[in-house]
Amino acid sequence: MAKYLSTKTYGHNIGLSAVFRQPNAVHSHCHLLHGYSLQFKFTFGCSELDNKNWAVDFGGLKPLKAWLEDSFDHKTCVDVNDPHKQDFYDLQDKDLCEVREFEGVGAEKFAEHAWRFADKLVREMTDNRCWCESVECAEHGANSAIYTPFITQKISMAE
């Protein structure tokens, strides 16, 4: 369990404007293309601080920002199992979009994909002293999803 937590946010204002659709949401308008300027909040944990009393040196996170930009900045995010995947590649061939394929799309899956990249990066940067506790991906002010691989305990409000 982490003794120290620190957070880094890449806000809606940096322009991670991604478009995607939920191919399995046939009951909802979410099966249609729609997009957001995504926001990502990373929570990092560690048991010991470095010699500067930091959990994570945020200056070393440039590869994380570059990955976010390459994955989401003016990108069309497509589920690998989307039955219309080729249509998006046809648009890309006409220079009408840039496709990025993911094993699942949407705020929950984007948070998971970002966590996987960030956790590997931070562990390498710190010789496993730090890790990524969670990632929150927000579509806008009202909708977000959080991914954490760590076990969480549900407590009753009566306790």
PLM ranges: what are they?
Residues 1-159:
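Charge-rich, low-complexity N-terminal segments
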